[in-house]
Amino acid sequence: MDFYQSLQLDPFILKQKIREAASKKEKCMYICSLFLRSLFIVLFAICFIIIITTLFESKHKPYAVVLFCMLMSIRFVDFGYKISHSIIGLAIVMFSLLVAPYVQLIKWSVMGMLIHFILLSSILMATASDPKMGNASLYGFSYLFIVYSLPKDSLNKNFFTQTSSLLFFFFCWFSVLLYRKHREKNKDKSLFKEIFLKGMYSQEKIWMLIYAFGISLLIVAREYVPFQRLMWAGFAFSSIVSSYGLMSIGFKERAVDRIIGSLIGCVLFIGISQFIPFNWIGILGGLALGVCSTYRYKTVFNCFGALAITASLFGVPGAVTIRIFENILGVCLGIMYIGVTEILIRKIREKHGLNH
């Protein structure tokens, strides 16, 4: 394996390579790859976001962040269907992300929740044939981030036109990328057969719908609660529910990692913010994220970017308080939602004699 190939590896694999290296030279190469990979990703992310916000106005920054995450993922992870149906799935994603912010303009909350549920369910069904590959978490985050980041007053005809152009351009780019990287995979796997004929009642598909319903409920709830950053609670909720229902990760372990990671991240931010400007702390967090391979440490350094933005609005004590409270709230809501859902599923199965 040469140096360029090592830069393409995940941090978890790179750390394995470092431990298993047969020589100091090989170990040094993998260590350099780990840190340079993180640096290149951060630099590319900064350039990527600057270009998009320059060409399409700064209001499109949430879309720039999401499109960057999609680009990083699509290079390595497909949607699990034959290429023509994967491109259809990509179109569903782009359309849903275009429409999602405008749902908040609907006056009737129940109708808004129903539309969010349909859009998010469609995204999950189209991209997460194998939820363990992480697409459910990525696109669930993307949906939440865009919906929460775009207030009503930013939504107008000009914004819609620009967003449509932006998403169409990236739809074309990502379609080419999907074709080049994944056209030989899953040649006989149909999106429509998988959803409507084979697996509609599978446990994974049921949990996709459960997850989409919970997220939709939480999005609509923001209209009725006084919290400043309900988006953070939404991310914590999403992480707990998606990891449990779609990736078979124990919610207790994920909840502990989320809360401890948030607490450590906030403490570190308080200390570092005494010496480093907020903007640089966000970049530092991005660099650290690039070398993390566990959820807990990713949660720690995710705090840096989020707090760097919020601290400029509420001050460091206020931002830290909101961050801790919202994460604990999201984790508690996620655990409660899983508990209630499990009880309902068990009762339904008992009623229909499906315990076996």
Positions of the model-derived regions?
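Alpha-helical transmembrane segments and their membrane-interface boundaries
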Residues: 1-139, 143-296, 300-304, 309-356
